[in-house]
């Protein structure tokens, strides 16, 4: 388990524990909030990185699909031209 996951698990565990007998001071509350914000910012950053990788992957996939589509269309055009040429050879004239 990486350090981020351990921190997240520890934070989650703290949420389910009984509160301390004395309320935390403002400094302690501020420290907890700073730590939580740091953890959340790290998670947000990781999610942003994952989204960027996903976007690049999707863009690459769409580019490959477009390339395959154009290759297929070109192959169909060539096939139609070959079929037309075969008809000319068989009949001695162009077919409609």
From Swiss-Prot:
Entry keyword set: Early protein
Biased composition (Acidic residues): 75-96
Residue span of region Disordered: 1-29, 72-96
Name by which UniProt lists this protein: Early E1A 11 kDa protein
Organism: Murine adenovirus A serotype 1 (MAdV-1)
